[in-house]
Amino acid sequence: MGFCKADAATSFLRAARSGNLDKALDHLRNGVDINTCNQNGLNGLHLASKEGHVKMVVELLHKEIILETTTKKGNTALHIAALAGQDEVVRELVNYGANVNAQSQKGFTPLYMAAQENHLEVVKFLLENGANQNVATEDGFTPLAVALQQGHENVVAHLINYGTKGKVRLPALHIAARNDDTRTAAVLLQNDPNPDVLSKTGFTPLHIAAHYENLNVAQLLLNRGASVNFTPQNGITPLHIASRRGNVIMVRLLLDRGAQIETRTKDELTPLHCAARNGHVRISEILLDHGAPIQAKTKNGLSPIHMAAQGDHLDCVRLLLQYNAEIDDITLDHLTPLHVAAHCGHHRVAKVLLDKGAKPNSRALNGFTPLHIACKKNHIRVMELLLKTGASIDAVTESGLTPLHVASFMGHLPIVKNLLQRGASPNVSNVKVETPLHMAARAGHTEVAKYLLQNKAKANAKAKDDQTPLHCAARIGHTGMVKLLLENGASPNLATTAGHTPLHTAAREGHVDTALALLEKEASQACMTKKGFTPLHVAAKYGKVRLAELLLEHDAHPNAAGKNGLTPLHVAVHHNNLDIVKLLLPRGGSPHSPAWNGYTPLHIAAKQNQIEVARSLLQYGGSANAESVQGVTPLHLAAQEGHTEMVALLLSKQANGNLGNKSGLTPLHLVSQEGHVPVADVLIKHGVTVDATTRMGYTPLHVASHYGNIKLVKFLLQHQADVNAKTKLGYSPLHQAAQQGHTDIVTLLLKNGASPNEVSSNGTTPLAIAKRLGYISVTDVLKVVTDETSVVLVSDKHRMSYPETVDEILDVSEDEGDELVGSKAERRDSRDVGEEKELLDFVPKLDQVVESPAIPRIPCVTPETVVIRSEDQEQASKEYDEDSLIPSSPATETSDNISPVASPVHTGFLVSFMVDARGGSMRGSRHNGLRVVIPPRTCAAPTRITCRLVKPQKLNTPPPLAEEEGLASRIIALGPTGAQFLSPVIVEIPHFASHGRGDRELVVLRSENGSVWKEHKSRYGESYLDQILNGMDEELGSLEELEKKRVCRIITTDFPLYFVIMSRLCQDYDTIGPEGGSLRSKLVPLVQATFPENAVTKKVKLALQAQPVPDELVTKLLGNQATFSPIVTVEPRRRKFHRPIGLRIPLPPSWTDNPRDSGEGDTTSLRLLCSVIGGTDQAQWEDITGTTKLIYANECANFTTNVSARFWLSDCPRTAEAVHFATLLYKELTAVPYMAKFVIFAKMNDAREGRLRCYCMTDDKVDKTLEQHENFVEVARSRDIEVLEGMPLFAELSGNLVPVKKAAQQRSFHFQSFRENRLAIPVKVRDSSREPGGFLSFLRKTMKYEDTQHILCHLNITMPPCTKGSGAEDRRRTLTPLTLRYSILSESRLGFTSDTDRVEMRMAVIREHLGLSWAELARELQFSVEDINRIRVENPNSLLDQSTALLTLWVDREGENAKMENLYTALRNIDRSEIVNMLEGSGRQSRNLKPERRHGDREYSLSPSQVNGYSSLQDELLSPASLQYALPSPLCADQYWNEVTVIDAIPLAATEHDTMLEMSDMQVWSAGLTPSLVTAEDSSLECSKAEDSDAIPEWKLEGAHSEDTQGPELGSQDLVEDDTVDSDATNGLADLLGQEEGQRSEKKRQEVSGTEQDTETEVSLVSGQQRVHARITDSPSVRQVLDRSQARTLDWDKQGSTAVHPQEATQSSWQEEVTQGPHSFQRRITTIQGPEPGALQEYEQVLVSTREHVQRGPPETGSPKAGKEPSLWAPESAFSQEVQGDELQNIPGEQVTEEQFTDEQGNIVTKKIIRKVVRQVDSSGAIDTQQHEEVELRGSGLQPDLIEGRKGAQIVKRASLKRGKQ
């Protein structure tokens, strides 16, 4: 019986251990003691806890098993669960009240055990539930000590960080460095010898030690190899930190260990900057003594002396000056240290600087002097100091602001008083003629204004646009200021140039109190703007109801007629301000008031579909039948616009649907014209006549047939419209449809009974018309049904028949003060752009008009108007209004934006039209300004005139251009070529040349054959124009007008093949004969060439060219080293004269002012330079002073020469440098100036990041840029700006946008005329809470501190909202991780394919991932817009097809030059380097999936430089950007450091930088040598007769390794993912594809199963890799390439490659197998590293056996790795060490793996395998192709060696494999 009980107890324990709950409960029901235990004291709870059976544990606890029962070793269930890492069990036990700090016999706590085994989750849970990590073992060791000893860094970091103040999350070594804990640091370094481990913020422990001035740990780190110059991504080195902290000993230590003294942060700060900014004089001195660069500049141009001045560090300033720092050194913004001191108010520093000679009047880039800044910042002591030391009180900024302007705007009354007392003028004006009073009024500073008025400031002072201070005050609504100004004599009725009074301004802004104050002072309501708007009009326009109410209460006239007779009610209706309409109507606003064209407010409401407004107007008596001048009613307009609801409303209010206008057009006619069927339905239902005729007899069916509206034709026919109705010309609807070529309508009309044989009044049938006009389809339809006998012969000319239409317009101007700018600068017939849209809706569709010589003149093919939607229009006008109404501000000078407008649609030819003896003219549809005028009686016969553009590269011989000449226009090809006209014709060509400095002229070149070019001459001048026009009604602008529009007029009697405009320097020419003569320059009158008799033997044309040399250009380039005379050239050059000719050239300015000597030849500083190079070659200057005699007279030098050439005088004291200086200067002088515009496109990729595309273009081809097709939005367009050919253009961003700099990417590009000069700038938003906008400036030079910058263009940009679709960025994200996905493309794979297949495979990947970027790539590969559009048209449905077509086209074009490197470069340039990395980088990364970033790979994030130009005065007065920076500190939450992106650090615990860690109460080490290790409890049960059938083996591989995946004991899943960048299954690519496609042969399956007994296990382990290959092989293009090479890849070894089949691999690889136990699982990880020429190739295969083994040994034998069954062991360390980025060499490092298993005696055996390359073999010349193997074993056979602390043996094996190469 006792035996049965023992069996039952054992069976119960076995059930508890295996988790068989039912069996265990049965035993308990049968009376088994729940607390029974085995021979080691383990009860059911212990066993279930160890195995992790949560349900069993919970049930046992419910059954009241004793929770705190201990084993013989003193372990509770919590100890055992913690040791085994069973976190769920740990939670249950703790929740049931288990003692978290219970100690076993030797003092081990559960926390100690979990820390020892690296169970991080258990450690975290125990700590959170009261575990005390300071409870030590009997030996005095804490959990931290054992975790340190075991090298569990994550656990160490958590233990150290837990419970500390703040949220410190630094890695363990950093904590040790912070606490100067050398002992802990030493142990940590023993476990991981890398001392340069990075924190989350990118700092090393040495950085931390430097910050906390911990010298001991710093020395330890340096001794252990810490990099003293380690540079994280932000560029901050330990020396920077030590210099900032001020620890002299630390700085000396770092310098002694080789710290680089010139190292710079990402913002270019040196250690000297840091020391100077914090006032550390001693450190500054040490650094200077070690050679620190005293003039080093930060990114913003700050030098150390600026830093010291900013920090008010007097001693530092003195020290730097003592070491010869430049006292007036300047930043990028040209701020000197004195500016900085003035900005910060540091009086003492300013005094020292001034005493040492600083210039008190130095000007910043925007013209601010230190005095301006002191006045702005209200530093009165600094201001007084500056004035005492000579600062100019009248100094002005770039925009003309004096210190008094600045102080007045900022409202600093004491400063204002002081300045006025010191003699500043109260009425001084800036460039916009604004006084300080304007400034004070605009900013609302009443006290300042009052004081200025007391000091004789003029209350009515007028600015440039006649704005007074009262306008400024009224605009901001500052009633107090308004009253003050009115009390001091300000006139309330003074108007600006646009006619606005202060009351208009207040009305616009809606400032009621301000308006009331003005009205009380008798402000006139009758004053009108230039467009006739009263204040009430303005209030009505902007919807200011309260203000309109106030004006009406003060007797405003509600029906005052303004411009074009518009009343306030018209304006309110036009702007849809319903509240204003409802206010005006009861107050007497008349709904009947007509505008000049008879439109009532109801007409406007009807046209704009404003239902509520229309109801209000009708309610107050508005007539639904009111007629305009042309008889148009509101119903006409609503019907034409297609507003069904409005039509129904008007008809319900007695509108007459049959009422025609003056031409008889009814609403139904207009509906038929536009095709609005629903409106036609409403009209018919209300009884409208379906066959109403116009004056010319057109019915609605005629109109619908003419305009091709087939649905309406059907509708009218359904409602019994007369299908054969005739017009007065006898045209039926069938005639109209035939004339317009509408085949479908012709067919429909015939089906509905239209007679095809009807003839018009001149006897024409529809068939005859169709034939005459060439409509083949219509002819075919009509031919069948028309009676041929009725087709009468007609004359050649067909008279077109057009229905009438409405052609009146109403200008309800969107802008009461200024003209809106359209595509033309001039206005057209006083029409407003918005209303031209309305006009276009009424006029016939010109693109449907058939050309015919019978019509004398046809208007433009494409009317050159700009259509702006009403809301856009209002916005545009508002911006324009801002400029006219704002008191002038620097923004209006510096911002170069103009309103973006849509470009017109382009047709094929620029011009193409027929002309006969009556003449005609045509404007270009694409180029504004292009026009061809053929006067009457010029053509002998009907002629088609064409005009098109020609690319220079298409010409046989482009126009020959000297270096100072350039093409000013596109090359124009006119047709017919060689046409001769009876009298002159006129061609006007737009050009883009700038007159530069006034020294250039335009020349027309012509070519008859494309090879020879000559100057075009015409004997007809401008005076002949009227005679040439021959009575033609064509307006020709004057030469002045053409010059403004940049149009060149050519008068010619024939058409050559080509015309082109050339820009060159002005020349004065004449014909010189044997009698001699002279030429004098008109540009520089002192320049003269004299030709004596017989210098030439026959009459020849000679020219004299004089090019002035501006002094400022010489100064800018050369300083005061030399001065120059004008350059004088006799053309043609290189001509020899029979007698010497005389030349006179003015002397250089410096020589004229102060002749240095009267010497001659080489002794004089005056040098004569000459270049005899002719033609188009570059000038080569030489000094001919020694061989030419100069005679001085009247400030000129005279000399003679036998050869025509270029001559130049230079006054250069360094005579040897004269030629060099001249060459430099000449290069700048010869650059051709052009007028170009900057256009900016933008797109946001997400909320913070976006892209800008900047264009600098001459002719307007914006709509052809690729950005139009890629969801970019135009955000800015500049006015025309002068740029020079070849000029580098540098872009600078400021404001809330920051450029993101990529490696080797510059934000600059060069201007080339007639090219799309393009620059891509990736940007990110600095502050997402503010508007994503800023300023983009273009400069001639990069922002260096020494350059005085001239800003070419300053654009205000706002990024468009992010429109995320299935865009490129989304698509790119789905590709990650690319290196893992495309391991198929690594070198190891490609090595087995042919070169062709390799290229094709790569091309396939490129085209698959190019997506929308293909168009960018096309641009980068220099494909034209036409090519890109053709690709787009030919492949409309697929991006893949478009990418494929592009790459094919590129390969065809490049031929042999199509190199992958070129393609990679292009991909990088368009920001698609991830594709290149995917293709190129996988081979390099084969040793490590996630390599450490190289320390040198810093991605600098550029901070914006301040530019000259501000959006408003407030911006101009803001602190300069260069002063807005924070100081370096690695641990404080400083903005300076926080912008750094975190680089991939070693995967430690999450880290943050914060406060100091207190570790004084935390015991780490005790006196013991090393911490004791806990051994696991023996859970084996004694043998019994009862079968062990209760055990339920759980072979879950994932579960087996889940506990190892957290620490250094990486699970297999991690391993496989880490090694699959370049790895594959044993058989490589082909076998992998075979597995994926189910095509592997049976033989292969058998081979594999020989070594893999459970293939499912392998698949689950390598699942990441399997999925990768599944995805890539699903890709059709890659699959296609791979399939072609599959035959080869399946049999690599036959071709002498290095791969082996599985059986060979098994034989050649090392393996240890234990075949004990009933079940065997193998996990196989194979690494193939690609063949590199001449290098050793490694092939490694690891077989890991997983077994079940029930240990039967003595009770005391326990597994050291407690908690893991022997069957569930895993490798203790990763299979391969990660290699640091900087350590990646050709020779792989050692790789160490450890494996543990239990031998037959129950001992724990540890096998350690060291794999390393023994040597490298140069296989390039190897003949022997046999495989070699070297195996070295270390250790005494396989006899176990005991390892201290563990029972077991260590087997060390080194294996390497080398192979020859065929």
From Swiss-Prot:
Q: Region 89 kDa domain: what ranges?
A: 1-827
Here the segments flagged for biased composition (Basic and acidic residues) are 824-834, 1489-1500, 1637-1647, 1681-1694
Q: For the region Disordered, what residue ranges are annotated?
A: 812-834, 872-900, 1481-1506, 1598-1720, 1744-1767
**Superkingdom of origin organism:** Eukaryota
First and last residues of every ANK repeat: 40-69, 73-102, 106-135, 139-168, 170-197, 201-230, 234-263, 267-296, 300-329, 333-362, 366-395, 399-428, 432-461, 465-494, 498-527, 531-560, 564-593, 597-626, 630-659, 663-692, 696-725, 729-758, 762-791
GO CC annotation: ankyrin-1 complex; cortical cytoskeleton; membrane; sarcoplasmic reticulum; spectrin-associated cytoskeleton
Q: Where in this protein does the record say (3S)-3-hydroxyaspartate is found?
A: D691
List the residue ranges of the region (UPA domain). Answer: 1197-1331
Q: What is this protein called?
A: Ankyrin-1
What organism is recorded for this protein?
Mus musculus (Mouse)
